[in-house]
């Protein structure tokens, strides 16, 4: 369960950071 959540976070966090910081 935790590796799945870690994978989701690793997938979503860069996209969220990209959208917020406008650094892609």
Swiss-Prot record:
Pfam families assigned to the protein according to its UniProt record, in alphabetical order: Antimicrobial_1
GO cellular component: extracellular region
Free-text tissue specificity from the UniProt record: Expressed by the skin glands.
GO biological process, one term: defense response to bacterium
Primary site of residence: secreted
Subcellular location: Secreted
Disulfide bridge partners, by residue number: 18-24
Keywords annotated in UniProt: Amphibian defense peptide, Antibiotic, Antimicrobial, Disulfide bond, Secreted
Family of the protein in this entry: Belongs to the frog skin active peptide (FSAP) family. Brevinin subfamily.
Annotated function: Antibacterial activity against Gram-positive bacterium S.aureus and Gram-negative bacterium E.coli.
Identification of the protein by name: Brevinin-1Bf
Organism for this UniProt entry: Lithobates berlandieri (Rio Grande leopard frog)
